[in-house]
């Protein structure tokens, strides 16, 4: 190969790589979408004469030269190709993501659209052209009283979840199974409702010494709202017991008030209650040798901690009645749980 042939070859390659041809000059036939390639046709060969392009269109740049409309090859229509080759592909309108098909805002007073017309997407990829598939059925009236009602998940099958606000037998059975594992009646103080400690308790008795009222945040259940005395003899009124009809005064300079709030009510010194166990289980205790006095229990209830993810004993080993059965869990929570005052 002489120098002239090498220069022509380099010029031809640079022209083909540097210039981007027009779509109508490349996709001149639907056969171009076929992945099949003839064995006798190489990469550098020109297209067949049956449907060829002008030399100026490819070699001299393509984009710079005008396209010859009198050519035997007609302009390829992309819309016709996609309609014929893609199943259920919508060309009209904007591009739609399969994960966000026909999303609408929920029912509000400003946008009075009923919830039962809410549309969502199906988990089946082979969806049909019918876009109004209702997978979430909201059977509720369009009134303000039920606007914020939380729907319940009912799994009819694993491929068709249905959201509804009506209780069904299957939902009640599932709730019963969950309550048996996560809530127990043996520890009632875990689930008692705390009073509004910012209010003055009813029928508060009068005391000979001066009672000082102290302001504190509404969501702080630890700080006493009323105190008596000064110095080491300073007493604080338990804010929770006072709303339950019991006026218990405890020393604040010693650990009496702190011990009462932590291990009687389960309130941390930062003002937040301790988190109860996220799950319960019953385990069998091993027999101990040389047991003296009260016999040990045969079974033990354990609770799972959300912080350390461990099973903690919620009862004592001895088979005796305890005045505050939650004290065993609150002792662990005081050492393990991270209490924060940020509610955001």
Swiss-Prot record:
Family matches, as Pfam families: Rua1_C
Protein's name according to its UniProt entry: Meiotic expression up-regulated protein 26
Keyword Repeat: no
Record localization: Nucleus
One Gene Ontology cellular component: nucleus
Top-rank taxon, per record: Eukaryota
Lineage of the species this protein comes from: Eukaryota, Fungi, Dikarya, Ascomycota, Taphrinomycotina
GO biological process: meiotic cell cycle
Keyword entries, A-Z: Meiosis, Nucleus
